[in-house]
Regions:
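A cross-kingdom C-terminal cell-surface attachment/processing module
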Residues: 566-587
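Short acidic, Pro/Gly- and aromatic-enriched capping/linker segments at domain boundaries
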Residues: 140-166
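C-terminal low-complexity, Ser/Thr- and acidic/Pro-rich disordered "stalk" regions positioned immediately N-terminal
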Residues: 520-560
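Cleavable N-terminal signal peptides
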Residues: 15-16, 25-26
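N-terminal secretory signal peptides that target proteins for export/translocation
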Residues: 1-7, 588-592
Length: 592
């Protein structure tokens, strides 16, 4: 059920920039921890990346852990065909990138200069231009290999190696149906209460025990373990996530986030309702750097209305990153590290190492002209290098073409009562939403999510910075929303929901910060009259010089006739000098 109604923007508010917050994962663990000590072990979060291609599936699990830093082990369940050579350890960076790439985001729109008739530019258009100039994040758009004689192809500079890590684990694979608790006990570990009963339904899976070397643990905050992701590959179906096991160490609610990377399809849960969260709605500026707190509270409201519902928060091609991008698109080396290297093993040799096409006469002449002044030995070396480079470029172009995917993000918050069965994932129709651009004084934009042929779905929350300086033209073109001005000195960052498991659910109230009506959730902002329209949001046809709006850029101070607006503008300009330092967006006024 779609939760996002049509947008009507009612106001804006600002808050001074604070310190950056560091993104942290949030999800639920498909396994459990056992310790050699009496101190309780807790887990609040884990993220799961499931990468699929044909019969092959590669799963990466990054757990959260809170407990003693010595003498503990992690138990996961894997398909029966998994062997130790199919289990490896990754750097956390790869899962962190997926999280940042797909997380719900806060985007700021700025009213463009009403006296500048040029086209409106968006922040992601700037990003795309940079990518195009550099051959794209995966090397797409690089010169053809035939042009390598005169200009090096960008594919030559790609990192095309999968990265693995010498992790902190000692892996032991038990046979399906093995007595895991007995094995743990014989090795000095104490399984959590109820482990034996919880494991019974999973007799067809193999227990994977990862004993943790305390000397290799990375710490965050000085005393909390930050464990590396564990990756395994299988040719058996892996569409059911054994998440109920994570309840054995759960002190309260857990957040389950599943990333699915598939060549063609978006994914949803098949045994739970999947809905689209509100997207493309307006938020007060105070939520900008507290997106985790806001989203926690919003999801609580969603679950009250739609209990036991997964959120489909993101579905986008892997060579993109949303609008705006919170980080760069996934690199080919990252895709290989997350599982594409396994898929490459089944690619025929001729496809992995194709022959370069023959040079045309013009290309051959251009190359010979470029080496005609070299000494014989240098000429031979250059010819050999050129041949190798052409072969490398063709191979890498094929590699890039083979590894294009759709990245889906599913999110669920649960406890023992709201997870009666393990979630099952499956393909779903393509979805697009959260990308419509705002128009007019109120920044009206469609909040609808539609299914169709293209995956361009994101969860975006908007904030608007109306034009502050005095308008000095006769026919201003108002309310064109785009990217920040070139001379804006504030932090150019896309803020995302982060560290949900450790953020408050009550400090940021959706009833206060949401400025778009969402009747389905009972969120109906106060009528415009109570907030008063913004002073500078008057008629676009007002002749220059038009009064500026409230210098603080908050809600309006008045909407009277021209003389009243003129007085309000004078007061606004005075206030700008007082509060300018506390309002990053007032740097916008430097343009006048």
């Amino acid at each position: 059920m779609k939760l996002v109604p049509p947008v009507r923007v009612l106001g804006a508010a600002t808050l001074a920039l604070t310190l950056l917050s560091v993104p942290s994962p949030a999800a639920a663990f498909p396994g459990f921890f056992a310790s050699k000590k009496q101190e309780p072990v807790k887990t609040y979060s884990t993220q799961i990346a499931v990468m699929k291609r044909g019969a092959d599936t590669v799963v990466s699990v990054m757990p959260d852990y809170e407990g003693p830093l010595e003498g503990f082990a992690m138990v996961m369940l894997v398909p029966a065909d998994v062997t130790t050579d199919k289990v490896t350890t990754l750097k956390r960076d790869f899962i962190d990138r997926l999280d940042t790439l797909s997380a719900p985001r806060f985007h700021e729109y700025w009213e463009q200069d009403p006296c500048d008739a040029g086209p409106v530019e968006q922040e992601w258009e700037r990003n795309l231009k940079v990518e195009g100039a550099a051959g794209g994040p995966l090397g797409g758009g690089a010169p053809t290999p035939e042009a390598g004689a005169l200009k090096p192809a960008k594919e030559l500079f790609l990192d095309v190696k999968a990265k693995q890590k010498e992790g902190e684990y000692k892996f032991t694979l038990l046979e399906p149906g093995a007595d895991v608790t007995a094995w743990l006990s014989s090795h000095g570990y104490k399984a959590p209460e109820g482990a034996a009963a919880a494991l019974k339904p999973y007799g067809a899976l193999r227990p994977l025990v990862a004993e943790v070397d305390p000397k290799r643990i990375e710490l965050v905050g000085g005393d909390r373990a930050q464990l590396s992701p564990v990756r395994f590959a299988t040719t058996q179906p892996f569409d059911t996530i054994p998440s109920r096991l994570g309840l054995l160490n759960a002190p309260k609610e857990q957040e389950l986030i599943i990333f699915v990377i598939d060549p063609e399809a978006r994914y949803e849960t098949k045994n739970y309702k999947t809905i689209f969260p509100p997207t493309n709605i307006q938020l007060d500026f105070t939520a900008k750097e507290r997106m985790g707190e806001f989203y926690n509270a919003l999801y609580d409201l969603i679950l009250q209305k739609h209990p036991q519902s997964f959120l489909s928060e993101y579905a986008w091609p892997s060579d993109g990153c949303g609008q705006p991008c919170a980080t760069e698109p996934l690199m080919i080396s990252e895709l290989l590290s997350l599982g594409a290297d396994v898929f490459e093993q089944s690619v025929p040799e001729a496809e992995r190492h194709p022959k370069p096409p023959e040079l045309t006469k013009e290309q051959e002449k251009a190359f010979k002209d470029s080496i005609k002044d070299l000494k014989p030995k240098e000429k031979r070396e250059r010819e050999k290098t050129f041949k190798q480079e052409r072969a490398t470029v063709v191979e890498r172009q094929g590699l890039l073409a083979r590894h294009k995917y759709v990245v889906s993000r599913l999110h669920y918050r649960y406890d023992g009562k709201t997870l009666p069965s393990d979630p099952q994932i499956g393909t779903a129709p393509a979805a697009a939403g959260g990308t419509a651009q705002p128009k007019g004084k109120d920044g009206e934009a469609s909040t609808e999510v539609k299914t169709g042929d293209v995956n361009k779905l994101q969860t975006r929350y908007n904030n608007f910075h109306p034009w502050v300086p005095v308008i000095q033209c006769q026919t201003p073109d108002r309310y064109r929303w785009g990217k920040a001005p070139r001379d804006y000195r504030g932090l150019r960052k896309t803020w995302i929901t982060d560290d949900l498991t450790r953020k408050s659910h009550t400090q940021i109230k959706p009833t206060v910060v949401v400025k778009t009506a969402i009747p389905d959730l009972g969120l109906v902002p106060a009528p415009a009259a109570s907030a008063k329209p913004e002073g500078a949001a008057g008629s676009a046809a007002t002749a220059a010089p038009e009064p500026a709006k409230s210098g603080c850029g908050c809600r309006a101070v008045g909407s009277g006739d021209a003389s009243e607006r003129s007085v309000g503008a004078t007061l606004a300009l005075a206030l700008a000098g007082v509060f300018g330092a506390a309002r990053a967006r007032l740097r916008y006024s430097r343009r006048t």
